């Protein structure tokens, strides 16, 4: 059985209590998948209080039902910012090349 490793909250720009909630959601809905943060909260540049958190999910496409449950968990969370999810297997190579420099591993 693979062990999941989570990065500490300081790896991305969110509060520790927000990290606890987010990491619990990721462990529940994306077990065994690598998840990366990117964008302003990953780089720390131009972050505002309500800046969204961009997450890239590695692996096979997420089945529709599982994706809906993940979206629901994020919507019902107490996180005060929007979370945008992208699946690395489904994005254009140009977009992937653009985000790769800012990728921060948050779940392994």
Q: Which residues make up each language-model segment?
A:
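Short, well-ordered beta-strand segments
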Residues: 54-56
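Catalytic core of pol beta-like nucleotidyltransferases
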Residues: 1-34, 42-49, 58-108
